[in-house]
Design a protein with these regions (language model features):
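Proteins enriched for Cys/Gly/acidic motifs involved in redox and nucleic-acid/cofactor modification
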Residues: 76, 103, 170, 179, ...
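N-terminal glycine-rich anion-binding loops that anchor highly charged ligand groups
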Residues: 76-91
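Residue-level recognition of the N-termini of beta-strands and the immediately preceding loop/turn
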Residues: 82, 123-126, 277
Length: 436
């Protein structure tokens, strides 16, 4: 891990001043497109990337800054945020790519696909990528092989990927005659984009997204138990899109017994997505076949899928995560209830939090979080706004808000209200890349 990553800067929301924005690269993934999210608030929810004119000459630092900005177009989850930029041997911009989520092309492959579609000859070209290319075959092929086969002569990367299943990309490229440069001055910026993903990978557990929806004063149900609905349709649709991008969605036995949810993922029209997450229940009370989460008695027109259900008979988060990781789950969504959120937050196991809040006040009812034993303020887990991913940190969804949060960096004593600032990198004064 880079030293003091929380004190480092990211390329921020802007390109270096020497680049002149001209066109926009929309977030156009089939599953997470701006169009799919746009209806929620009447505005595009995903970021757009300001691109320089094709053919504009970029310095090494400008090209890597652009790769970092492209990475921010991606979606958090099973894979890290990564961006890639291709220039010709003289630095003229050719193509930009980024990774849109698990199962979609990696950033390098995305940029190479754009080059193939345009008929661009990449012989002797340079590639700048925010993370060392992977060297393994998973849901997609090894990027290091694709880069070498495309004719790229020089590759620049910001941060080494030494995770178990991806390491070795730079070494492979060198073995194929590609000149590889490590741009260490950008390493912390790349790490900061994916800090919690690297932690999850090192701990050999899924990346965890927790979701909660509450009133302004923090209740998820009234005193009599009624809760449908606190948030409006836009927020609920957004929650289903998070389910859709996760490998598994998990609730506790109490929520299962009280609410009897289906835990399926549906689109804005209420139709089930073809890809459905594994439905997981954590707890020691056996969930019988009559509960909808088991998938044995689906609604009319929906096929039964009991094989897509798993109950883990434990109250130990680590035991649950070990079981899911062994089954190939790399992105887990915690849907509820409040005890689950508190339990995982207390163990510092939440990597991303999406909190929906409705303009409603109850004064009493069921709290959004419990089982979090905080006796004094210093013990409370600290979160901070997530400005680095695909979405703005706070979005308006109809009459509700969605706040995107990540834990404060480990090992920091963050005061209330303190936040990592993200100024621009000064491309004019960054050192030249090191050749290794």
């Amino acid at each position: 891990m880079p030293q003091n990553p929380s004190q480092e800067v990211l390329a921020g929301a802007h390109l270096p001043a020497t680049l002149t924005p001209s066109t926009h690269l929309p977030h156009n993934d089939l599953d997470y497109s701006a169009a799919e999210y746009g209806h929620l608030a009447g505005l595009p929810a995903a970021r757009t990337l300001n691109l320089p004119d094709p053919g504009q000459t970029l310095s090494h630092d400008e090209a890597m800054s652009l790769a970092l900005q492209a990475a921010r177009q991606g979606i958090r989850g099973a894979n890290p945020l990564v961006g890639a930029v291709i220039t010709d041997r003289d630095g003229h911009l050719l193509h930009v790519g980024y990774h849109r989520g698990a199962g979609t092309p990696h950033a390098e492959a995305d940029a190479l696909a754009a080059a193939r579609a345009a008929g661009t000859d990449l012989t002797g070209a340079r590639m700048y990528v925010s993370l060392e290319p992977c060297n393994h075959t998973g849901r997609t092929g090894p990027c290091s092989h694709a880069v070498a086969e495309a004719g790229i002569s020089e590759l620049y990367y910001a941060y080494s990927d030494d995770t178990e299943n991806a390491a070795g990309g730079a070494a492979y490229l060198r073995s194929q005659g590609v000149t590889v440069h490590a741009m260490e001055e950008f390493a912390n910026a790349s790490y900061l984009l994916n800090e919690r993903w690297f932690i999850a990978a090192a701990e050999r557990r899924p990346f965890i997204t927790a979701k909660s929806a509450s009133t302004l004063d923090g209740f998820i149900a009234a005193a009599d138990g009624t809760s449908k609905w606190i948030t409006g349709p836009a927020a609920r649709i957004d929650g289903h899109l998070i389910r859709h991008r996760a490998d598994a969605v998990m609730i506790g036995t109490r929520t299962t017994l009280m609410d009897d949810p289906t835990l399926d993922a549906r689109d804005a029209n209420g139709e089930r997505f073809e890809k459905q997450p594994l439905r997981v229940v954590m707890g020691k009370t056996e969930i019988t076949e009559n509960y909808r989460v088991r998938g044995l008695n689906p609604p009319e027109g929906v096929e039964a899928d009991p094989q897509n259900f798993l109950q883990v008979f434990t109250h130990d988060p680590r035991e649950l995560l070990d079981e899911l990781y062994a089954r190939g789950v790399r992105h887990l969504m915690i849907e509820g209830g409040p005890g689950m959120v508190g339990l995982f937050a207390g163990e510092d196991l939440i990597d991303e939090m999406v909190w929906y809040r409705a303009p409603m006040i109850m004064g009493q009812g069921k709290s959004a979080v419990y089982r979090l034993l905080v006796d004094t303020l210093a013990q409370a887990p600290r979160l901070q706004l997530d400005d680095l991913g695909m979405f703005p940190a706070v979005r308006v969804l109809g009459n509700d808000t969605a706040t995107h949060l990540v834990p404060a960096p480990r090992g920091t004593a963050q005061e209330p209200g303190e936040r990592r600032t993200l100024p621009k990198l000064d491309a004019c004064h960054a050192p030249e890349p090191r050749l290794d």
